[in-house]
Amino acid sequence: LAERQLIDASDRRNRLLRAQIDLWRQNPPVKRIVAAGTTAAFPLMKELVKTVLSLEKGELYLAGIDKFLEDEAWEKIDETHPQHELKELLDYLTVRREDIPDLQAPENFGREVLISEVMRPAATTEKWRDIAGKKIRHEAADGITLVNCADMREEALTIALLLREAG
């Protein structure tokens, strides 16, 4: 690539992100800047989100962040957990989950609590014994189907077929 005076896509992306970060730090925009829907999975993206939050009118919205999980369990999220990248981002930003505004109010509050419990970090599953105290209504499970699969291949095929039917 160097012989042809070219750079690869990730290098280009990083240069563009660095330029945007530097521009906003040197000349903060007066208009509203929103960072939304990112997990900021790589360092420069995290830095860009941090820069957005430092702006006078900078805002951050993260869809799908689990705000129902208690803090003790949140701290036990490991790299295998679906919320891990969001947790890493918030830790980097030193922002609490509660401080991230919701994009919209939950349509089914009970379902949100149920999903939070289902996705609870493995190190805290002893808390499942207390789930009755959360008063999750039966309607929270409406539309949810349990499919038992023999292996990961069958699971992947089942998911693919269900997504095809839904689409």
Model-identified regions with their sequence ranges:
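Nucleic acid-machinery interaction/catalytic patches
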Residues: L1-G167
